[in-house]
């Protein structure tokens, strides 16, 4: 066999392998839910959010921003949002972040205070540090919309 007859066969073989592997990949196309698992699934996330709410109430830096809010709705929406961001089966159906925060004039200090409280709430619920970092990484893209930058 010559080089010219091997080349088309080699290309055909590589194409077939790529199709098979591509097909296998699409069969396993579910999102990575390992973070969701590490957060304790929906129940664990709901516990973190509940503890976060208590921390917000006690935090003079931010509690005025949350005055008058529907606590049950906030709990439900934030739980859904964290569940979805962590790869869980939930779907966040609340308002868009930019719209929701447009009239709040949130400062860096307030944003950081909420982040600190979220970390404290996760620590209170024995969430591993690696999972905490992964969740914070998922939340970072929301920063410009929350701050209305």
Where are the regions that the model predicts?
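Bacterial N-terminal signal peptides that target proteins for export
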Residues: 2-14
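Residue-level signal for pocket-adjacent positions within structured domains
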Residues: 30, 34, 57, 61, ...
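Bacterial signal peptide processing site
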Residues: 25-28
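Compact alpha-helical subdomains of small soluble proteins
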Residues: 71-74, 78-143
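Post-signal-peptide N-terminal segment of Sec-exported extracytoplasmic proteins
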Residues: 32-35, 39-80, 124, 130, ...
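C-terminal motif of bacterial Sec signal peptides marking the signal peptidase cleavage site
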Residues: 20-23
């Amino acid at each position: 066999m010559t080089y010219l007859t091997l080349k088309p066969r080699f290309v055909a073989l590589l194409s077939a392998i790529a199709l098979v592997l591509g097909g296998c990949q699409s069969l396993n196309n579910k999102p990575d839910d390992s973070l969701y698992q590490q957060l304790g699934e929906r129940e664990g996330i709901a516990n973190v959010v509940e503890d976060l709410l208590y921390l917000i109430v006690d935090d003079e830096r931010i509690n005025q921003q949350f005055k008058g809010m529907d606590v049950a709705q906030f709990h439900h929406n934030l739980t859904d949002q964290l569940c979805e961001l962590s790869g869980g089966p939930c779907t966040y159906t609340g308002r868009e972040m930019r719209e929701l925060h447009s009239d709040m004039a949130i400062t860096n200090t307030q944003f950081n205070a909420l982040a600190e409280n979220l970390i404290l709430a996760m620590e209170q619920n024995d969430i591993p540090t690696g999972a905490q970092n992964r969740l914070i990484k998922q939340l970072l893209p929301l920063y410009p919309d929350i701050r209305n930058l």
